[in-house]
């Protein structure tokens, strides 16, 4: 398997240009106050038949109709469009087969819920989505060989995205109406069978990572993502063991950090999980300015400024 570098891992997931890209249409709020997402010209054309989205081909904008001045009205409008588009062959893979019956919240202005949309539909309109990623680990002074170890699951072979790849110990999207902490507790049990009392007493907030991913390459849909990061320290290697509670993972392996580094550089981790692991390794001193000449770019690109309002 081809060996990569830490900066390549970051560039792969934070792949969208840092310059303004005139290729995309801008999804604008009903009062014109903010840009909420970037949409490809191909997808933008499907809005021509939607009376509640005003398309301006010259300005390359898609503006939510001014009369949709409440979150309830906007929710209803996007729900109607998403449901209708499920039947369009062009969206059969991304929308129909990817339908999750889970709502993601878009914010505008910052901190204020503006609209809730189907998770699968969010990918089509390039809005920010949110999640939590949790690094389960045994610190060196508590491990059997004096080396830091991480609990690493392998994604189920039946997963529609990145089947069989390595993942973070726990990860999940921030679906309405759950908050960040509620999602941490919920996902820890659902994905790894970890009880709430254990999580409450062992997990700590470790920051946030932000990036804009192009899952299908350049000039296609974009995925701006914000992931809240938590470190979950285990007391030892045996007392509490994560296991695949909901079948999202095939198994969990307690890997020595040297093996994690090796598999990370062999591109065995799901792309955004590779970034989260890299961030963990930076924070715990396994990637340093002395060990990697691209250290500054690695750290800064794990924390990209977003062009849209945020949570």
Please name every model-derived segment:
Residues 1-165, 173-189, 193-249, 257-311:
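N-terminal leader/linker segments that precede catalytic domains of diphosphate-processing enzymes
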